[in-house]
């Protein structure tokens, strides 16, 4: 084999490299939070949501989804059924996140050779990395009039001596998506029987 010379600096860390990262945090994150992880990130450049109803929506990065998009929780791989079946919801709750990172390009190789689409890292402090001074808490409630969705989120965290603790909970309830008036497919109208049309005349559109 021919000799190969590799030259690099001694003290460069992964954080020092140029990474194509989108970061959602603070007020921007609170404004963008949706019912699912995919809906939360849908406004980011190059990201869409593979929606299977009000409660299921996985992020799609540059057309890649499922196991080609690595979902992390605090930098640790999150294994759930959503990686192999898009009609399952991610086990991560975006309403509990303090920030969400979306990583694309060659930098995704840092997280394994399967993340060719990208990486979504959700930081929610469920595993505390430092001691909390005193006790902190958060309580938030959201309502969606389209699906009559109600979401309540609460967390409490603190420390006792050298032990950090964190408790959180989420309650979510959603109904069908409803619209005012009617939603009729013109193609189906040609094949609909008269009795069905009479029933539709007094019904409200439901998706």
Write out the residue ranges for each language-model feature.
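Extracytoplasmic beta-strand/coil segments of soluble accessory domains associated
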Residues: 38-80, 98
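Short, acidic, small-residue-rich periplasmic hinge/interaction motif at the N-terminus
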Residues: 1-30, 38, 66, 124
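Periplasmic-side early beta-strands and strand-to-turn transitions of outer-membrane beta-barrels
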Residues: 134-140, 144, 151, 155-207
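N-terminal periplasmic accessory domains that precede
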Residues: 37-40, 57-60, 69-72, 87-92, ...
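Outer-membrane beta-barrel channels and translocator barrels
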Residues: 34, 66, 160-163
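Transmembrane beta-barrel outer-membrane domains
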Residues: 52-54, 90, 113, 144-149, ...
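Short acidic/polar hinge/loop motifs at secondary-structure boundaries
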Residues: 77-106
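Structural signature of outer-membrane beta-barrel domains
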Residues: 11-13, 66, 78, 125, ...
């Amino acid at each position: 084999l021919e000799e190969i010379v590799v030259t690099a600096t001694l003290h460069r860390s992964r954080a020092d490299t140029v990474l194509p990262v989108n970061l959602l945090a603070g007020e921007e994150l609170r404004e963008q939070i949706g019912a699912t992880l995919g809906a939360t990130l849908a406004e980011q450049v190059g990201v869409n949501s593979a929606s299977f109803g009000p409660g299921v929506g996985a992020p799609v990065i540059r057309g890649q989804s499922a196991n080609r998009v690595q979902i992390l929780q605090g930098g640790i791989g999150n294994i759930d059924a959503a990686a192999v079946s898009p009609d399952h919801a991610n086990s991560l709750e975006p309403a509990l996140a303090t920030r969400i990172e979306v990583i694309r390009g060659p930098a995704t190789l840092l997280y394994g050779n399967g993340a060719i689409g990208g990486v979504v890292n959700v930081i929610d402090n469920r595993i505390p990395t430092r001691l909390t001074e005193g006790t902190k808490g958060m309580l938030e409630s959201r309502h969606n009039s389209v699906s009559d969705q109600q979401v309540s989120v609460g967390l409490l965290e603190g420390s006792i001596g050298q032990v950090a603790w964190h408790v959180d909970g989420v309650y979510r309830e959603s109904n069908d998506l409803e619209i005012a008036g009617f939603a009729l497919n013109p193609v189906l109208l040609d094949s609909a029987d008269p009795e069905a049309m009479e029933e539709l005349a007094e019904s409200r559109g439901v998706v």
